[in-house]
Every structure is written in structure tokens, then in C-alpha cells.
């Protein structure tokens, strides 16, 4: 094993050869820059006065401070105002190298690898049932509400060939996870229910595939349904650019019923047939390159991360660079928990060793030069801080006068935390908006409590148990905690919270009517109207309108309300009572009293 590891091609050479250094500087009257920066940094690089820049923005109606992160357009405008030429330079470093660099392999080093298949489709169209049959396990019943809420990667063998599957959730909250699945995959199996046809998430999945330039195989599920309409379904697919072979197109199709285990082998055959055309290959003799599919925190083990190796071979003990982390892989296992020493290209694995769960969708690369890896990780970490500053600054400046409701999200997995964040950040109304200031994995910590207290945030947890000590601290610090295990509930709660910040609009609602049958006069109080309740109710404090011969003569409030000399809060239809109307004594027998309450209508 050690010989194979030392013989692997190092990724460092490819990276170093393609890194492009570009300095942010003012040179010969031209300001060269690579991206966003703070006002302070811009002033420092151009020898300008930062306070003067802030002042000029203020005069232009923009309330910035020296830490405000400038948009590229604002940098260009400042250059023009100060008679600088400007040039946006491309810089490839630790912040973006995995998106910009290509890894080259010699043809003789390439071998056939397992295809990576993503299953997509509309909610309840049978994706999870299909993957359930593929894995020969029972995911469906273990998920809250029967809807898949975590991305998983699994592998099967068909006709002596490995096939890797990714299952992506169908609910609209998981759009980012489906997009990520499309970008990782070689082929998308689009599950469409024979009775429902093409639905919103079906269309969305098709768009993801087109954007990622990924071929589609359609699996028409629920063929056992009596109300299926295949002609309609095929037409709907064609309208969305998916023309199947039966209609003269190139898209392969399989038909079946996942629940009845029908058509699945035929689907595998279609996958292997398309793989022959795609000629998928990788170099097992290089350090690993791949993508993080999912991550979560296990209380005993720490960060558990599901990955897919797309090129190279991953060994236990390898160092992986992902985002701003550089970590040694301590354990490797397959999706069933079996320990592994290595993972081949095209295969999934669950790994441990990361201090913090990596963001789902992040690319990773194996690097055996620790000093170089730390440099790249440091550059990425710096850029993340700049982006966070920009995000916070942009949110504060673009609140549009709305009340900002800060939210902290804690979830059991990274992908779900991301999905919740993506949904909540779109929520707003005319007077308030949601701002997610933190979204991560694992139990609530003291740091979370400090952040929530400092930012006046609500904490939402998903699929987590909150420790009694934390609950007690939440009460002491008066921090609101809301826990759920279904995403819909979190979204609904946030909408209700937004509604609470809307200025209320009230309308008058008539609640009852009475007529005066006798008049009493008391020197200390004034006139008492002995009355009979004809309809509805009268309540203490209610609005009252007094009519005499169909003419409105007074509007006021019920100041006192008594029955049989006892004070009461309410009198119902058919009962007599005595009342004094506030600041009104000119009451007469046969006057009609109409009672009203203000009812909120928004």
C-alpha cells in the first residue's frame, strides 16, 4: 500500500504551474485590483484619505465606514474620480484555484472509472423509493414526513460494474443541493411519475442538467398507476428540451415502478450503455481530487463527511485541502460503515479528520506539501472573512429601512443548514426581513449563545437535541429557541415572525345590538341605561354607537357593565343589563345601542 501511495502523481505541480500572481497596487497611474476590498484597503493602496472617501460617499447619500467592502463598480468609480486608470486582474490563488485549475493526466495513466449518477425529480415522484430499492435498505420510513432531507451517496454493482448514486431531496428548499448534485454527476436519472407528469422540481432539475451540461436518462416511475398519461408526459418533457428516443431525440428512457421493484435492472442497463458512450476515465495513480457531498457532526467521532473521489485515489492518512481547511484523513469507510484503506475514482466514502464539517459542494484536493497547503488555506480563509464582512455590510446598507430579524441556524448536517439558510434569506415583507448571521452544524455552543445575545438573534435548530444546560442558559439570557425536524415548519415560523412586525391594520366589526328599556340616574356616575341585548354580545370597553329613530347621535365606549347589580365583562343575547356610556348622559328609552370591536385584518 505504501508503495502505491508514494508512486502517486502529486497535484502540487499542476497547481503551482497555473497559479497567477496579481498584486493590488497603483502603478504608473493605473490601479490594478483583483476583487472587492474595504475602503481602508483602497485608501492605503492609493495613498488617499479614507475619511475623505467616507465623507464623499456620505454626500452621495451612502452611509459607509472605512470597513465597508467596496463593490468592483465602486472601486472603478473611485478611480475615475481620482483620475486613475483601472484594470481588473485575474488572480489564481488559494481562494479560487480549485475552480480555475485543470489537472492533466497522460492517456496511458487513465483507466475506466465508476460513473456518478444523480437521481432527481419532483417531490413524492419516487426518487427515495427508487434509491431505496437500489440500496436494498429502507430510507423512506426513517426520514421526517417521508421526504428525503439529507443528500446521500451510495454504490451498487451491476453486471460486474460499479455505479455510484447521489440522491438529492425534492423539496424546493433543497434547490442548491440539487444544483450541486448536477455539477458533481456524470449522468442524471430524472424520475417522473407517470400519473403526475412534469412538475416544478422536474423543470428545475432539467435546468440544472442543462447548465451543468450533464446528460439525462428519464425513469418513468409509478407505471402501475391506472391514471397514467404517457403521451402527455413525453410531450411535457419535449416542451422542456428533453426529447426522448421514441420522439426522435437522444434521451434514453426506462419505465417501471420503484415500489414494485420493476424496471430497475433496465435502468441500470441504460446507465451502462450511456457510460460506454461517455467513456468515463480517471487516473488512480495521482493524489485525490473530488467533492464534498454532505457533512455532519457526530458527538463521539466529530465531523463525518461524505465525499466522492472524482480523480486519483484517496488513502487513509492523506492530507486534504478543502476550503480554508487542511486536514489529515483519520478514517475511511463506505456508505455502510465498513472500514476502507483506500477509495478509487468514482466512488463515495465517509471520512473523518476535519476539525469543522466542510461545506457541502466544496471541492477538495489531496496535497502532501503541508507548508504549501497551509498557504492556500490561509488565502481562502482571508477571502472568506472579506466575503463575510461584505455580506454583513451589504445587508445593513440594503435593509431599505426594514426591521432586520437576525437568525442563527444550527443543523445536524451541513447540506440541510445550507438549504434552510437559502430559504430563509428570501423571506421578507414590506416592513421586515430575515438575516441569517450564522449557519452551521452541531449542537448549540456557548459561542452561539454569545453571538445570539450580541446580535439579538433567534436560534433555530434542525434535528438536534438541546442540552438541559443550554436550555437553562437560553432562559437566563432571554434568547428565543425554536426547534423542528421538518424544514417547512421553520419556514412557516419565520413567516409568522415577519407578520408580527407588520404595522397592524384594524377594521370595526359589529359584535351585537341592544335597545334601552329603562333609565336610571346616579349623581356620582350619571345616566344608567337599562337595556336588553337583542343580538350578539356586549363587552366591557366595547365601542358603542347610539341611534335614536335611525339617526346616529353618539359614538363612545361602554364604561360600566352590570347584571343584577354585579359587575360583568360580557352579556349575551336575550339578557338584560345596565350600562353607563363614557362621557354621555343624554340616553333615552328606545335608543338603539350597536356594539363594535376593532379586529386586525392583516
Curated annotation (Swiss-Prot):
> What Gene Ontology cellular component terms go with this record?
cytosol
Extract the InterPro entries matched here. EF-G-like_DII (IPR053905), IF2_II (IPR044145), IF2_N (IPR006847), P-loop_NTPase (IPR027417), Small_GTP-bd (IPR005225), T_Tr_GTP-bd_dom (IPR000795), TF_IF2_bacterial-like (IPR000178), TIF_IF2 (IPR015760)
RNA-binding as a keyword?
no
Q: Region annotation G5: residue ranges? A: 257-259
Give a GO molecular function annotation for the protein. Answer: GTP binding
Region feature (G1): 121-128
Q: Please give the SUPFAM superfamilies that the UniProt record associates with this protein.
A: Initiation factor IF2/eIF5b, domain 3, P-loop containing nucleoside triphosphate hydrolases, Translation proteins
- So where does GTP get bound? 121-128, 167-171, 221-224
Q: Region (G2) spans which residues?
A: 146-150
Q: What is its main location?
A: cytoplasm
Q: Where in the cell is it found?
A: Cytoplasm
Keywords (alphabetical) are: Cytoplasm, GTP-binding, Initiation factor, Nucleotide-binding, Protein biosynthesis
Q: Does the keyword Iron apply?
A: no
Q: Which superkingdom?
A: Bacteria
> Domain tr-type G spans what residues?
112-281
Region G3: list its residue ranges.
167-170
Q: Where is this region: G4?
A: 221-224
Family from the record: Belongs to the TRAFAC class translation factor GTPase superfamily. Classic translation factor GTPase family. IF-2 subfamily.
Q: Report the function annotation for this chain.
A: One of the essential components for the initiation of protein synthesis. Protects formylmethionyl-tRNA from spontaneous hydrolysis and promotes its binding to the 30S ribosomal subunits. Also involved in the hydrolysis of GTP during the formation of the 70S ribosomal complex.
- PANTHER family, sorted: TR-TYPE G DOMAIN-CONTAINING PROTEIN, TRANSLATION INITIATION FACTOR IF-2-RELATED
This protein is called Translation initiation factor IF-2
Question: What is the originating organism of this protein?
Answer: Mycoplasmopsis synoviae (strain 53) (Mycoplasma synoviae)
Organism taxonomic ancestry: Bacteria, Bacillati, Mycoplasmatota, Mycoplasmoidales, Metamycoplasmataceae
Gene name, Swiss-Prot/TrEMBL: infB
